Amino acid sequence: MALPGVTKLLLLPGVRAQLLNTPVRLSHWATPGRCTKSCHAYLQKNLRFCTTRSFSSVSPAAESSEDTVLKWLLLLIPVATFSLGTWQVQRRSWKLKLIQEMEARVSGKPIPLTTDPMEIKELEYRPVKVRGHFDHSKELYILPRTLVDPEREAREAGQLASNTQSGAQVITPFYCSDLGITILVNRGFVPKKKVNPETRPKGQVSGEVELVGIVRLNETRKPFVPHNDPSRNLWHYKDLSAMAQVVGAEPILIDADRGSTVPGGPIGGQTRVTLRNEHMQYIVTWYGLCAATTYLWCKKFIRKVAL
């Protein structure tokens, strides 16, 4: 006679082995009527012990091994975030030093412009002086651009809204009489309504002039920045080779300083001497994650508190 709930349990190896090794008195099975009740009670008692022993027989060594692996794997998180935070500290120090060097170069004494391409590369952000005259008939326009005004930016620092206006930077061929070559000069910023040179005739300087400018190098097109369109005289980034080819000049560019500004003309001094420096934010982020994950790791594996 099959007993309810017994058949399946008897199939378990641990239960079957336990029953085979358990002595049973024959008197319990002698009487047919008594056999069923006695057998049922006996099996329930012994099966409860066997199943408990069977299901609780997971190796403690296996559990300990799994916990150890998990423990050291999770420890990699605070270690990695601490390393990234330290790396950002080093990057910030390097960036601050680079900014200081750039500011020192810009504030240096103007030197004569050289025509050697290798020397030009070493002169980026260095002020140079040139003498010659402009060819306003071949102006190029880099747009859209906003006015670089350090004083206004300092006043509006921290404000949600600013009075920045959109416009363009005017690139004009400049024949250097002392060098015998034509270079490119970024005369400065004009608002959008003044891009057309006919709207600013007083600002079109004629005759030989002497000016000071900052040497600038070629720009690389950034993601999402439109391509230049030389046929329409639309430039979105400084491609010196293409610009020089269009106007017949050398691929040398200087940004005229603010002292070169004339009434009605472009506003000079549009060199922004700054570099993106967000390393402090990254430092706080990585070290914050390191502190949080270290706390959770110690709570879990040192203090043995369930998370």
From Swiss-Prot:
<feature type="transmembrane region" description="Helical">
    <location>
        <begin position="282"/>
        <end position="302"/>
    </location>
</feature>
<dbReference type="GO" id="GO:0033617">
    <property type="term" value="P:mitochondrial cytochrome c oxidase assembly"/>
</dbReference>
<protein>
    <recommendedName>
        <fullName>Surfeit locus protein 1</fullName>
    </recommendedName>
</protein>
<dbReference type="InterPro" id="IPR002994">
    <property type="entry name" value="Surf1/Shy1"/>
</dbReference>
<keyword id="KW-0472">Membrane</keyword>
<dbReference type="Pfam" id="PF02104">
    <property type="entry name" value="SURF1"/>
</dbReference>
<keyword id="KW-0999">Mitochondrion inner membrane</keyword>
<feature type="transmembrane region" description="Helical">
    <location>
        <begin position="69"/>
        <end position="87"/>
    </location>
</feature>
<dbReference type="InterPro" id="IPR045214">
    <property type="entry name" value="Surf1/Surf4"/>
</dbReference>
<comment type="similarity">
    <text>Belongs to the SURF1 family.</text>
</comment>
<keyword id="KW-0812">Transmembrane</keyword>
<comment type="function">
    <text>May play a role in mitochondrial respiratory chain complex IV assembly. Probably involved in the biogenesis of the COX complex.</text>
</comment>
<keyword id="KW-0496">Mitochondrion</keyword>
<keyword id="KW-1133">Transmembrane helix</keyword>
<dbReference type="GO" id="GO:0005743">
    <property type="term" value="C:mitochondrial inner membrane"/>
</dbReference>
